[in-house]
Amino acid sequence: MDHSKYLLTIFLENDDSFFKYLSEQDDETAMSDIETIVTYLNFLLSLLIRSKDKLESIGYYYEPLSEECKTLVDFSNMKNFRILFNKIPINILNKQITVNKGYLSDFVTTLMRLKKELFLESPEPITYIDPRKDPTFLNILSILHEK
């Protein structure tokens, strides 16, 4: 298994394997590995956005990928709520790195092949600040638009 496939497989697994792996690496290697993950996630995001644009071109509004989409959280199960918003550092000393060699591994292999075949150009990273939601920029814009 090559390194990128290994990284993606442990990253997408629903456990702490990726954190355990990163904790055992030096800073430079960890940052390089994170950059590899970001590259593949950007590819997936680009693929999703292009698909959303195709749907919108025929008049279908795909809300989950839209800019103004609001996420609802189900508060009926407080255990899931705690897991979702738990920002306490993870104790990974006694954890082991597990590599899923089933469907997740197949998905990662397919994703890597698709990325090589499609070669979607990733746009430059852009930070979008919505002045309607940022009071500082809203004030600056109101000053600039005064007559």
UniProtKB/Swiss-Prot annotation:
Q: Does the keyword Lyase apply?
A: no
Q: What induces it?
A: Expressed in the late phase of the viral replicative cycle.
* Cellular compartment(s): Virion; Host cytoplasm
Instruction: Indicate where this protein is primarily found.
Output: virion
Q: Which InterPro entries does the record associate with it?
A: Poxvirus_J1
For this UniProt record, give its keywords in alphabetical order, as a comma-separated list.
Host cytoplasm, Late protein, Virion
A single GO cellular-component term on record: host cell cytoplasm
Short name of any one Pfam family annotated for the protein: Pox_J1
Please explain the role this protein plays, according to its UniProt record.
Late protein which is a part of a large complex required for early virion morphogenesis. This complex participates in the formation of virosomes and the incorporation of virosomal contents into nascent immature virions. J1 protein is required for DNA packaging during immature virions (IV) formation.
Oligomer and partners: Homodimer. Part of a complex composed of A30, G7, F10 kinase, A15, D2, D3, and J1. Interacts with A45.
Instruction: State the family named in the UniProt similarity comment for this chain.
Output: Belongs to the chordopoxvirinae J1 family.
Please state what the protein is called.
Protein J1 homolog
